[in-house]
């Protein structure tokens, strides 16, 4: 597949991947600092607690990474002609029935798994997805605490790399029978409908993991086989699923 088929004109795949690595590991450093109550890098302020008039570590971390990603992408590629949409800016940008004015769209989730971030489980992630025509073509899923950066280009390749750039391939499990398949499910968003469905499927077992990014990573490592989320208020949104979908495809 040619580069022009998956990226905007004038955007080099290698240049883009280099910038995405820089932004991703920078985001990891920011989130890890906030998670530990330390001074974050890149000029961001240490979080004040809600009791002390601040927004708390979760909101501060979310907003800091949001700013880091938006400024990084717009600054590195000022002429790319894409639109940047994040979970934090969606309410301002999205008007019902009105399409966003660009063929290419970045969908960003600066902190996937806020509850796990707050609880200190380490199961949180950062998502970046480049979308064209309502379909993700490039996805990045960063797991800061695991030092894993999952990258996928639809129709090209998908892999995991660490901070040193060492790559590992996607390893889907070889389990085939329904009774052998392992489910990855939410630790905090479970209801009677999901429990009933899991019981009816009679799978081989299940694993509770926080954040969509961390759940999908267990599938990419071959630790689990499927993820089920039912419709409802807590169901994953576009910024939760776009990047993982690109890596899985």
How would you label these PLM feature ranges?
Residues 68, 125, 243-247:
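Short amphipathic alpha-helical face segments that pack within enzyme cores
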Residues 31, 62, 73, 114, ...:
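Residue-level signal for inorganic ion chemistry
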Residues 62, 87, 109-112, 116, ...:
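Acidic active-site catalytic centers that drive phospho-/nucleotidyl reactions
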Residues 1-111, 196-199:
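N-terminal subdomain of lithium-sensitive/metallo-dependent phosphomonoesterases centered on the IMPase/IPPase/PAP
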């Amino acid at each position: 597949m040619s580069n022009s088929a998956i990226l905007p004109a004038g955007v080099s795949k290698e240049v883009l991947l280099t910038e995405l690595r820089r932004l991703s590991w920078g985001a990891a450093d920011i989130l890890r600092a906030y998670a530990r109550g330390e001074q974050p890098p890149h000029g961001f302020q240490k979080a004040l607690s809600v009791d002390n008039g601040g927004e708390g570590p979760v909101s501060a971390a979310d907003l800091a990474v949001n700013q880091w990603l938006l400024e990084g992408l717009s600054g590195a590629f000022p002429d790319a002609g894409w639109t940047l949409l994040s979970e934090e800016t969606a309410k301002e940008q999205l008007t019902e029935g009105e399409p966003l004015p660009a063929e290419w769209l970045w969908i960003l989730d600066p902190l996937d798994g806020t509850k796990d971030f707050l609880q200190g489980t380490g199961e949180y992630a950062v998502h970046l997805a480049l979308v064209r025509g309502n379909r993700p073509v490039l996805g990045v899923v960063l797991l800061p605490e695991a030092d894993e950066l999952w990258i996928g280009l639809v129709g090209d390749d998908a892999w995991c790399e660490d901070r040193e750039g060492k790559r590992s391939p996607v390893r889907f499990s070889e389990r085939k029978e329904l009774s052998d398949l392992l489910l990855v499910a939410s630790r905090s968003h479970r209801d009677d409908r999901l429990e009933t469905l899991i019981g009816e499927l009679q799978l081989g077992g299940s694993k509770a993991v926080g954040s969509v990014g961390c759940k999908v990573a267990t599938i990419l490592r071959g630790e689990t086989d499927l993820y089920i989320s039912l419709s409802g208020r807590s169901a994953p949104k576009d910024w939760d699923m776009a990047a993982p979908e690109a890596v899985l495809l």
